[in-house]
Amino acid sequence: MAADGYLPDWLEDTLSEGIRQWWKLKPGPPPPKPAERHKDDSRGLVLPGYKYLGPFNGLDKGEPVNEADAAALEHDKAYDRQLDSGDNPYLKYNHADAEFQERLKEDTSFGGNLGRAVFQAKKRVLEPLGLVEEPVKTAPGKKRPVEHSPVEPDSSSGTGKAGQQPARKRLNFGQTGDADSVPDPQPLGQPPAAPSGLGTNTMATGSGAPMADNNEGADGVGNSSGNWHCDSTWMGDRVITTSTRTWALPTYNNHLYKQISSQSGASNDNHYFGYSTPWGYFDFNRFHCHFSPRDWQRLINNNWGFRPKRLNFKLFNIQVKEVTQNDGTTTIANNLTSTVQVFTDSEYQLPYVLGSAHQGCLPPFPADVFMVPQYGYLTLNNGSQAVGRSSFYCLEYFPSQMLRTGNNFTFSYTFEDVPFHSSYAHSQSLDRLMNPLIDQYLYYLSRTNTPSGTTTQSRLQFSQAGASDIRDQSRNWLPGPCYRQQRVSKTSADNNNSEYSWTGATKYHLNGRDSLVNPGPAMASHKDDEEKFFPQSGVLIFGKQGSEKTNVDIEKVMITDEEEIRTTNPVATEQYGSVSTNLQRGNRQAATADVNTQGVLPGMVWQDRDVYLQGPIWAKIPHTDGHFHPSPLMGGFGLKHPPPQILIKNTPVPANPSTTFSAAKFASFITQYSTGQVSVEIEWELQKENSKRWNPEIQYTSNYNKSVNVDFTVDTNGVYSEPRPIGTRYLTRNL
């Protein structure tokens, strides 16, 4: 302890050294210290899994692990050269930092994103201090296209042919025009700060690019505000899918809100009440919006599981069109001053309609143009009338971006943590988990009487169970719940010729109304060797291309088959089992009855419904106090905070108002529609299969039978079709 009035020795030494350095200080950033030099044997503060991404590490740690690591190595070498020249790169933003950011501007990996963010923060902090290195001055000139050597298309990894091939560039949402132009005012990967009420699962509410000084779109009428990209990028335990489609938005309801309700004479089970709105919404909640059939094949043939992690959305190349009629001639022209309005319902204030198997999703074929569906919703009803708790929403009450021709809109979202979807079938059955070579040490009741001469007498006897009486063995687990369905045959002659589509169906009753249990809990479609049967409303049924809406024949639909889950789940058309119904005694025999419905019991295990290329990705878990295993019955991921609804409408423009005042509501508008492109990028986390199985697996393939046609392609009229549903459970795994 130092005496009063004196400093400790260590503090005095430290202050003295600091004063000496300050006394000799020269203008500019201070010179580097010896410890700031890169040492070849130094580990430094390197990000886990990398060799060079981090400060103070050595320069000889072997080959970089990826592009971000390679950029970090070049950055470290540039710092080393500056240190050799007596400059201190750590205390100013310099050309090496700028080159590092530029090299990683298309890198969406965690390390790439983190590296760019760190040096962007460094630049912002040092700018007010004048410690940002000025870029090299060049004479202004027009942007010239960059010449590229023609190359054959190749996989996104850049390899796979003889010799090294250039890798295809990933979609850079932050670019305008060609791939070498300046970034967007609002790049997709850098959303604005989210409002406080958004929660941790949503990164942004979306943003529109600002208007330019000439009141054109932010990117100008002459330049596109984004690039077309449809691809998948496979990166070990992740895959990033990017889809771009062209959309068209008509003016719905002549800009009016309207009540909608069931028709007079409808049955009580079919009554409803709600509202239609002049807004549309974007729906990309189907797997085939994001995966091509070939990518889906790669996904399910190589992975035991997958789940979504992040989503980026962008509207770009927005064009507002005006339609005029003159002497029977229709003219369509750009309207550069009209707007569309866009917003995301990130607080889930509006009734959520995504995940209800609606039409209107992004089409599976990228060349097809689609119409944005109209937003409508239902609220509480009594018959076809509203009740006191019925809710009405005016969407103009929500803040929205107003975008003109050339503007864009971006939105980013992070999925909540959900379990991996199990994309495998079991190679064992739940009732066959034992070693057949060894008897159990537990006993079971094997007899309740024994012969005695010409009669029998009550006598309890017990046995150990082995392979010959495997049905009697003790087991740990029960199959999953059951809600029995009627069995239907694909061969019409096997079915009863009465009308039982409603009367014979399994239903539930809620608030005085009956609804089909469709598809209901996940249950197996049929037993072994009974492929022609299916549960009446216990499977997903997709329509083939060109099928009518009502009463189509079986040849025009695609019926899914959940046969692979019969290893753990009951068969939907069979009873769950039998249950004792009395107390046996001397003069009363034991009796049982079939169990056709069975709720959840302790010890039950089961598989959820499979997902399909044509099926939904997610569903919103209802906002209730209680819920049990909320896995959507139509398949996919149950989410408390799913991707918000993104809504869009054409802003009304009054048409030729009268020159005299009228208090009446304006009801005449110029005829407009809007169009543009939409891109959706989703990052998926993969669970790679690593089976030690010896014999070959069953995998999905397109050559399942001899065919003169190519599946998943267009016909002579240019119509794309999907001839069969593709699930995910081809690989196998033990229970």
Swiss-Prot record:
Region named Phospholipase A2-like: 52-97
Residue span of region Disordered: 22-44, 136-224
Keyword annotations of the record: Capsid protein, Clathrin-mediated endocytosis of virus by host, Host nucleus, Host-virus interaction, T=1 icosahedral capsid protein, Viral attachment to host cell, Viral penetration into host cytoplasm, Viral penetration via permeabilization of host membrane, Virion, Virus endocytosis by host, Virus entry into host cell
Main location: virion
Cellular component GO terms, alphabetical: host cell nucleolus; T=1 icosahedral viral capsid
Feature: compositional bias, Pro residues: 184-194
Gene Ontology molecular-function annotations: structural molecule activity
Annotated disulfide bonds: none
Biased composition regions of type Basic and acidic residues, renumbered to the chain: 34-43
Highest taxon, organism lineage: Viruses
Xref: InterPro entries: Capsid/spike_ssDNA_virus, Parvovirus_coat, Phospholipase_A2-like, VP1/VP2
Localization in the cell: Virion; Host nucleus, Host nucleolus
SUPFAM superfamilies recorded: ssDNA viruses
Annotated GO biological process: clathrin-dependent endocytosis of virus by host cell; symbiont entry into host cell via permeabilization of host membrane; virion attachment to host cell
Gene3D superfamilies named in the record: Parvovirus coat protein VP1/VP2
Biotechnology and industry use: AAV capsids serve as viral gene transfer vectors that have been shown to affect long-term gene expression and disease correction with low toxicity in animal models, and are well tolerated in human clinical trials.
Note: The ratio at which VP1, VP2 and VP3 proteins are synthesized in vivo is about 1:1:10, which is the same as in the mature virus particle.
Family stated for the protein in its record: Belongs to the parvoviridae capsid protein family.
Described purpose of this protein according to its UniProt entry: Capsid protein self-assembles to form an icosahedral capsid with a T=1 symmetry, about 22 nm in diameter, and consisting of 60 copies of three size variants of the capsid protein VP1, VP2 and VP3 which differ in their N-terminus. The capsid encapsulates the genomic ssDNA. Binds to host cell heparan sulfate and uses host ITGA5-ITGB1 as coreceptor on the cell surface to provide virion attachment to target cell. This attachment induces virion internalization predominantly through clathrin-dependent endocytosis.
Domain comment in the entry: The N-terminus of VP1 is sequestered within the mature capsid. It contains a phospholipase A2-like region and putative nuclear localization signals.
This protein's name: Capsid protein VP1
Annotated source species: Adeno-associated virus 2 (isolate Srivastava/1982)
